Amino acid sequence: MLQISNLLLVADVSAQAANNSAVGMIGSFIAAALLIVIPATAFLIFVSQNDSLERTSTGRR
């Protein structure tokens, strides 16, 4: 951790700028989860469940 703080001091990056960047990055991760990961997971589970039901009802396994 000491190396990172030294790097920030050498690069003349303010703590507020670093904090805003970190908050933005976390916000991007949350937005990606909401917009991409959760709908894709729900779709794959839905398709998987329907395929399983179709294979079971037709007698093919």
Curated annotation (Swiss-Prot):
Decide whether keyword RNA-binding is in the record: no
Signal peptide interval: none
Listed under GO cellular component are: photosystem II; plasma membrane-derived thylakoid membrane
Matching InterPro entries, A to Z? PSII_PsbX, PSII_PsbX_type_2_subfam
Which key words are in the record?
Membrane, Photosynthesis, Photosystem II, Thylakoid, Transmembrane, Transmembrane helix
Subcellular location(s) per record: Cellular thylakoid membrane
| Domain of life, source organism | Bacteria
Q: Which Pfam families match?
A: PsbX
Give the record's membrane topology: Single-pass membrane protein
Q: Name one GO biological process term.
A: photosynthesis
Q: Which residues cross the membrane?
A: 26-46
Q: What's this protein's function?
A: Involved in the binding and/or turnover of quinones at the Q(B) site of Photosystem II.
Return the similarity comment.
Answer: Belongs to the PsbX family. Type 2 subfamily.
Cite the record's note on assembly. PSII consists of a core antenna complex that captures photons, and an electron transfer chain that converts photonic excitation into a charge separation. PSII forms dimeric complexes.
Quote the protein name from its UniProt record: Photosystem II reaction center X protein
Provenance organism: Prochlorococcus marinus (strain MIT 9215)
Q: Name the gene that codes for it.
A: psbX
